[in-house]
Amino acid sequence: TILLESGTDVAFSATKQNGGVIHPGYDPHPGTLKAKLNPPGARMYPRLSKELGFKILHTGTLVVAYSDQDLKKVDELMDNARINGVEKVERLDFEQLHNREPHISDKALGALLANTTVMVDPFEVAIAFMENAMQNGVELGLCQKVRKIEKRAEEDFVVYTQDRQYETRFIVNAAGVHADDVAAMA
């Protein structure tokens, strides 16, 4: 098993620029794949941080409402959270919000508080996952940009990079912002 990385290191592209907020899942529209996968994925991070040795900050998230329209949006997000199975989400009124955050603007009317939001260093997380994969037998091919994927037999593929080719039965496309381009090659 090999992981092909187009950059000079893992997390070389979009990952290193990610903000590192692990969203608990109140944003995705219920019924979507993201709504199904986001909450359980987010709940995995405390365990993964212990197992793989990366730092995690339990920050929580406030979505603050400054208008009646914003309050409606907060209520929609609360509904999403309930339907999507997000735990420890609260609707704060004016008084609760200002008691929690005394320096917030008096124009703030209320908020959604998601207590399970955590933050990570995306580069550190990517390195931890790659180190774990390598400890479990995965090779890392750096500077290996996929140029072409050819389907050979019923279950075989050949993946071409700029200077090598790899024969495989399975391809896991984790190309980030370039995932659509790689998928179109298969």
Segments predicted by a language model, with ranges:
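Short amphipathic alpha-helical segments
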Residues: 15-16, 76, 183-186
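Short, intrinsically disordered, charge-balanced linker/junction segments flanking boundaries
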Residues: 1-2, 179-186
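Short loop/edge segments at beta-strand edges and connector loops
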Residues: 5, 58, 93-94, 142-144, ...
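Glycine-rich FAD pyrophosphate-binding loop
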Residues: 1-17
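Dinucleotide-binding Rossmann-like beta1-alpha1 core, especially the glycine-rich loop
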Residues: 20-100, 109
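Short beta-to-alpha linker loops that shape the active-site pocket of alpha/beta-hydrolase fold enzymes
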Residues: 7-9, 97, 129
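Helical element adjacent to the flavin cofactor pocket in flavoenzyme catalytic cores
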Residues: 111-170, 174-181
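Hydrophobic anchor at the start of a short beta-strand
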Residues: 1, 88-89, 171
